[in-house]
């Protein structure tokens, strides 16, 4: 550590150190959703202090997940030492310094303390427009627009487009673009997109087959037992409601034989699309399906009224 203090951090490494009050020994996690680095690292706090160092070849937006399940972001840059200081009970408000972008992000976070949610969202929009070329703006987008709390899907899409236009080669922006664009394009209030696919029985289906009908598009994957539970709950709920919906299952499984057995075991005979491409399936991309299991609810006018519903009891069938 003496050598580090004397020479500083190497050009291909980053150092993240901090001091938190009102905590002795604990740990939290650091990771990159967008692929800035692989895996999840554990940062250990001892006597209220921590030091974390890793190899880094480019600036990375990293997520910090704390023991109380709150989350914040830090921008890691090669050759830099980044410092965090604050109170453990309000760790999301801790000051992060050491680079211009982290200080910009800290100033924004500090300015939002005590503001109403509406004013915070307005400030986030203004921040992204003003600082669209920064990684700090990407962090603000993730905190405010890549969240179920944001109901204005059109504004979320506009913010994503603003970032993409300003940073077309930024790996994090491109990841968010590919992930969220289909979701925003098919958000609540939007029309069911045009599609064409073949069921496991060899029948061609398109959006026209469901015109004038209520539809549930259900994403399943039987590598997780949650899909069995979700479908059982769904079937029970539909039976109780007099089954007023058409159901289209989109399976992300790669083994059709195993899929067929699973569906037979729970007595489900809805039409199934399974092209064995999992999350790379063109149809999955068209619908913006990202959670397994989950459901999208479409009314008889072809309008999406719910999406990404991951719990059966949260489904609204009274439309």
Segments from the language model and where they lie:
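Sec-dependent bacterial lipoprotein signal peptides
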Residues: 1-5
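N-terminal targeting signals for export/organelle localization
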Residues: 7-8, 117-188
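A non-transmembrane, solvent-exposed segment enriched in polar/low-complexity residues
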Residues: 7-130
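Short, small/polar residue-rich loop motifs at catalytic or cofactor-binding pockets
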Residues: 37-38, 191, 290-292
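N-terminal "domain-start" segment that seeds a small globular fold
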Residues: 174-207, 318-319
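Short active-site neighborhood of thiol/selenol oxidoreductases, capturing the structured segment around
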Residues: 205-234, 246-247
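Structural microenvironment flanking redox-active thiols in thiol-disulfide oxidoreductases
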Residues: 228-266, 278-285
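Thiol/disulfide oxidoreductase modules built on the thioredoxin-like
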Residues: 266-268, 275-319
């Amino acid at each position: 550590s003496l050598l580090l203090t004397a020479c500083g951090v190497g050009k291909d490494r980053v150092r993240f150190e901090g001091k938190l009050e009102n905590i002795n020994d604990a740990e939290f996690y650091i990771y990159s959703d967008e692929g800035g680095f692989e895996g999840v690292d554990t940062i250990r706090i001892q006597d209220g202090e921590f030091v974390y160092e890793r190899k880094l070849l480019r600036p990375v937006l990293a997520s910090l997940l704390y023991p109380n399940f709150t989350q914040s972001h830090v921008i890691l840059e090669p050759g830099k030492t980044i410092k965090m200081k604050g109170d453990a009970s309000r760790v999301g408000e801790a000051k992060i310094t050491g680079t211009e972008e982290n200080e910009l992000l800290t100033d924004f976070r500090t300015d939002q303390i005590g503001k109403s949610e509406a004013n915070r969202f307005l400030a986030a929009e203004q921040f992204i427009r003003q600082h669209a070329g920064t990684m700090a703006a990407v962090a603000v987008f993730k905190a405010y627009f890549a969240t179920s709390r944001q109901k204005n899907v059109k504004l979320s899409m506009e913010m994503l487009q603003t970032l993409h236009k300003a940073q077309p080669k930024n790996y994090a922006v491109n990841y968010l673009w590919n992930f969220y664009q289909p979701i925003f394009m098919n958000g609540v209030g939007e029309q069911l997109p045009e599609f064409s696919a073949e069921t496991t029985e060899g029948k061609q289906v398109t959006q026209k087959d469901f015109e004038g009908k209520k539809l549930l598009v259900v994403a399943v994957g039987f590598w997780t037992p949650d899909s069995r539970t979700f479908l059982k709950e769904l079937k029970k709920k539909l039976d109780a409601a007099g089954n007023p919906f058409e159901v289209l299952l989109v399976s992300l499984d790669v083994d059709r034989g195993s899929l067929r057995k699973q569906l037979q075991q729970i007595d489900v005979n809805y039409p199934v699309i399974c092209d064995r491409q999992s999350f790379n399936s063109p149809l999955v991309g068209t619908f913006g399906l990202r959670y397994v299991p989950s459901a999208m609810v479409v009314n008889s006018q072809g309008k999406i009224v719910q999406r990404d519903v991951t719990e059966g009891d949260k489904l609204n069938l009274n439309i």
